[in-house]
């Protein structure tokens, strides 16, 4: 039963990060220890986010507290609605 809860949480995270990546939106990533990182999401997988600024940093997701985009991603609104429609089927 617990695995189903995790599976439902992932469709929110992946489309959101993907929209930030595709639209090359600057983000501030706050870590659980209070450190603020800034840059653009270059890539991501299940465990890490590659954040590009002057250099590329590999940030482990378990260390991330909050991601704050400079603006809302446009593509995310469409993908979120599409995901909600699939979930209701």
Swiss-Prot record:
Biological processes, Gene Ontology terms: regulation of DNA-templated transcription; regulation of RNA stability; regulation of translation, ncRNA-mediated
Subunit details: Homohexamer.
Function recorded in the entry: RNA chaperone that binds small regulatory RNA (sRNAs) and mRNAs to facilitate mRNA translational regulation in response to envelope stress, environmental stress and changes in metabolite concentrations. Also binds with high specificity to tRNAs.
SUPFAM superfamilies linked: Sm-like ribonucleoproteins
Gene name for this UniProt entry: hfq
Species for this entry: Hydrogenovibrio crunogenus (strain DSM 25203 / XCL-2)
Protein name: RNA-binding protein Hfq
Signal sequence interval, chain numbering: none
InterPro entries reported for this sequence: Hfq, LSM_dom_sf, Sm
Domain Sm intervals: 14-73
Cellular component per GO, a single term: cytosol
Protein family membership: Belongs to the Hfq family.
Taxonomic lineage: Bacteria, Pseudomonadati, Pseudomonadota, Gammaproteobacteria, Thiotrichales
């Amino acid at each position: 039963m617990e695995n189903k809860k995790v599976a439902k949480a992932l469709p929110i995270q992946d489309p959101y990060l993907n929209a930030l990546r595709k639209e090359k939106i600057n983000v501030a990533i706050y870590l659980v220890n209070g450190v603020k990182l800034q840059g653009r999401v270059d890539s991501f997988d299940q465990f890490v986010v590659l954040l590009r600024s002057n250099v590329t940093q590999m940030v482990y997701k378990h260390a991330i507290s909050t991601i704050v985009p400079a603006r809302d991603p446009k593509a995310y609104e469409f993908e979120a609605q599409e995901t909600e429609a699939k979930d209701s089927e």
